[in-house]
Amino acid sequence: ALYGATFYDVILKDLIPMIDRTFRTKTDREHRAMAGLSWGGHQTFNTVLPHLDKFSYIGSFSGGIFGLDMKTCFNGVFADADKFNKKVNYFFLGCGTEEQMGTKKMVDSLRKLGIEVDYYESQGTAHEWLTWRRCLKEFVPHLFKH
């Protein structure tokens, strides 16, 4: 499977149901979020974007979609900005100012399509834990506002 695609099935079919059985969770899409850092941010996109019927919050810290056309990737999920923006309660991308990952370029492409995305830059940090802790601090409060 391309880039470990079966891992996404494990998240959707095994991990999330196990969490819901083990902990007192709200199981509807309006209360489900996924975020990840670095490659985990990329995995977040691969898990969430094809399954917006299951998630309404998306966070990626130093992860992104690179080398793909934003309008056509993930079966064109970003092509209809109004539909995407209504479905997703909060969309967050963050990275460090010293990273060369192209996250800002991705944000600019998404905004050009009309996608509502919150962008954060961690000042003076690179692809490192301080960046991701700061991104988490910025992201998490939004999970409780909508």
Give residue spans per PLM region:
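Non-catalytic cap/lid and distal C-terminal segments of serine-dependent acyl enzymes
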Residues: 1-146
